[in-house]
Amino acid sequence: MNAFTLYPAIDMRNGKCVRLIQGDYGKETIYGDSPLDMAAQFAQEGAEWIHLVDLDGAKAGRKVNDRHVLDIARQLDAKVEIGGGIRSEADVYGYLSQGVDRVILGSSAVSDPAFVKSMLKQYGGKIAIGLDARNGYVSTEGWLETSSVRAADLGRELAAEGAETFIFTDIATDGMLSGPNIESTVQLAKATGKTVIASGGVSSVADLKALARFKDAGVSGAIIGKALYTKQFTLAEALSGVKDA
């Protein structure tokens, strides 16, 4: 039986742990001064994975908070995945060769598909594809741009090129604590035939259990952000809730 994996999220901006609402850089709340301390706390509570986002990097198109990422990867036993501003093979190799377990490529899947396909060929399962969608269409550049590419179509294309893991974010629900978009997440898993990690909108352990019901359809886990920071539930409660799901 496949386990349903939880990914506590740390979004980094100016070296701090923050949350944005629907990706709006003007709607920021700071939750901590040290990404490493936050990650250590999640690991202590039982996290097997930590999901890191370099928000400055996503906006700038280059790595910005990489020092914090590598500190976490080197000092903690939990596995680490990172997205945001990764646009070159040097970036990908730099992270993977220094302890990061998985690199998430998002905007470049639309803007530079040849690069993404080449990275999939070279690094396989160590690359995850981040598909952030607004009304079914992929958004790029830290969600500042919406493309004319449908998430399901891009997912299918990249699955054929070797993508094994997708991270699907429904922007409308992100940071809103309004419940995840289960339907679109399951649709992407079915369209690609691969595993999809759900992101955005989780507000309760019940939401996580609802997602976990679809793990046999390919929904392999969920990223949790704001719900943990606003203490809707603890990570320990969440892990216990999905253990038998």
Curated annotation (Swiss-Prot):
Chain's gene name: hisA
For this chain, the family text in UniProt reads:
Belongs to the HisA/HisF family.
List of catalytic residues = D11 (proton acceptor), D132 (proton donor)
- Molecular functions (GO terms): 1-(5-phosphoribosyl)-5-[(5-phosphoribosylamino)methylideneamino]imidazole-4-carboxamide isomerase activity
Coiled-coil blocks: none
Key words of the record: Amino-acid biosynthesis, Cytoplasm, Histidine biosynthesis, Isomerase
- State whether keyword DNA-binding applies: no
Q: In which pathway does it act?
A: Amino-acid biosynthesis; L-histidine biosynthesis; L-histidine from 5-phospho-alpha-D-ribose 1-diphosphate: step 4/9
State the organism of origin.
Bacillus velezensis (strain DSM 23117 / BGSC 10A6 / LMG 26770 / FZB42)
What does the record list as GO biological process? L-histidine biosynthetic process; L-tryptophan biosynthetic process
Indicate what this protein is called per its UniProt record.
1-(5-phosphoribosyl)-5-[(5-phosphoribosylamino)methylideneamino] imidazole-4-carboxamide isomerase
Tell me which PANTHER family the record gives: 1-(5-PHOSPHORIBOSYL)-5-[(5-PHOSPHORIBOSYLAMINO)METHYLIDENEAMINO] IMIDAZOLE-4-CARBOXAMIDE ISOMERASE (PTHR43090:SF2)
